[in-house]
Amino acid sequence: MKIRTHEHHLDLLGTSSGYRSPGLHMSEIYNHYYQRADPKRYRGGAFDLVRMEAGSALEVVLENALSSRMAGERPGEFQTEEGIWFSPDIIAFEGKILVLGEIKATWMSCREVPVSPDQSKLTGVPSNWDGTSIATFPKQFDKYFTQIKCYAYHLRTPYARLYIYFVNGNWSPPTPVFLCWDLEFTAHELTEEWTAMKRHAQKVMKVI
């Protein structure tokens, strides 16, 4: 058997998931914000780019599978009144309610996220939440929620659904786990988050 290396030609800058209009994108703003806030965590590097590419590939597969089940679709790009582009994973209507769907794949542990009794059976983690009351995620998930709240603000909906594929589950042992949460934000939460990101774009990045 002869074996030779082969270049995979994957786009390790994460720009291959679809057409991007020229101009400022929402992801540039919140990525810049978190890189400044926690440079050690968001420092980048070759290994992080490989993980990003793998995560993006998983997200595309999940997006295609979930969009039909949610009676939704990937809607393409939206643009804010400031001229900022953003691309939700899924937009679905449940009756007259618009639901923003966001899909993530991560190597972080599911051990500290809100886990309902039913989810506990999937994760192997003791339940820490009843499944309906107010709950919070660990700080390391903040960037997910910044993205979701900014998108929801501009879509004028308080409703979102977050899907997370935990590649290594709770790490004890490393086993994939797929979890989902319905989210409902207050108008204040959405406005506060977008105001902070807009201020960062204006005062720090100086791009709007």
Where are these regions (language model features)?
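Metal-dependent nuclease catalytic cores that hydrolyze phosphodiester bonds in DNA/RNA
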Residues: 1-100, 105-129
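Nucleic-acid nuclease catalytic cores
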Residues: 76-205
